Amino acid sequence: MSKKFAEQALQELISDSFKVAIVRPPMIYGAHCPGNFQRLMQLSKRLPIIPNINNQRSALYIKHLTAFIDQLISLEVTGVYHPQDSFYFDTSSVMYEIRRQSHHKTVLINMPSMLNKYFNKLLVFRKLFGNLIYSNTLYENNNALEVIPGKMSLVIADIMDETTTKDKA
């Protein structure tokens, strides 16, 4: 069964007593989320030199997702939603911020265009430093729903704090 078919079937069930909200988030990240963010944190702590590549990725902090879903439930809304953080996820900036909050000195280096072309052919490089964004107009706030606004540095600080707390437990 495809996602599209499943969503259509769910939408056919909508009634006054049964609400359906479909949430299509981008990459979810946080201290205990499975996936590539944990690997990125570990890699960041080990690499004193980071390529300065300006990429953009739509992402959503797990705490922002849970708050958004709480709003959907409390307002009993229906529809299709594409929530994302108020900032785009920039891999170099995130790695730099992780190192800064870990009290590690970091050097950002600009990549020569010839090397950049070579690295862009590598899947792992494209996954880390490629662009993948939702349009800001894709999610229209027509039901007074909002994703908690935040600054990347504050979100990373929260993640680092949670990670440190878990490691001590």
Name each model-derived stretch.
Residues 1-21:
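Active-site Tyr-X1-5-Lys
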